[in-house]
Swiss-Prot record:
Keyword Coiled coil: yes
Domain of life, source organism: Eukaryota
Lineage of origin: Eukaryota, Metazoa, Chordata, Craniata, Vertebrata
Subcellular location: Mitochondrion
GO BP: bone development; fat cell differentiation; mitochondrion organization; neuromuscular process; regulation of growth; regulation of lipid metabolic process; visual perception
Protein name: Optic atrophy 3 protein
Keywords, in A-Z order: Cataract, Coiled coil, Disease variant, Mitochondrion, Sensory transduction, Vision
Tissue-level expression: Ubiquitous. Most prominent expression in skeletal muscle and kidney.
Record gene name: OPA3
Coiled-coil zones: 103-163
Keyword Coiled coil: yes
Function field: May play some role in mitochondrial processes.
Amino acid sequence: MVVGAFPMAKLLYLGIRQVSKPLANRIKEAARRSEFFKTYICLPPAQLYHWVEMRTKMRIMGFRGTVIKPLNEEAAAELGAELLGEATIFIVGGGCLVLEYWRHQAQQRHKEEEQRAAWNALRDEVGHLALALEALQAQVQAAPPQGALEELRTELQEVRAQLCNPGRSASHAVPASKK
């Protein structure tokens, strides 16, 4: 069962975005009913939006200097409530994007730190291996060559033979390896 690969955060963000639409509808209803919301939150942005929209349309059609009448209070309240609802959905969606970006950045940072730690561990191990190699090379250099060891063995056998057979000379001694 693959639990770690399941995109739980993305599913959570999708759920939040789905909940934002009913939330926006509730905010719109509250804005329509409340005088405070109508007067101070819905009407000014709605009138500004209406003024910019009408002015842009008039300029596109070639009319200059025409006076734009403001919306009546009911239409402005309706437009303001719609703008507030859309802004709520947009803010929730943007917030989800920002949170996903931060989460992704944190994952990337964590991944880079793990890679950096792995590289450092490999560097340390290579350093230890280099020191061990140098020590082994020094031991090999300090050890007598193989030919010298063979000569020492033959001499040792000759000395043993002389000690065991005091009457025989060193030239007649038979090495122990040939017996």
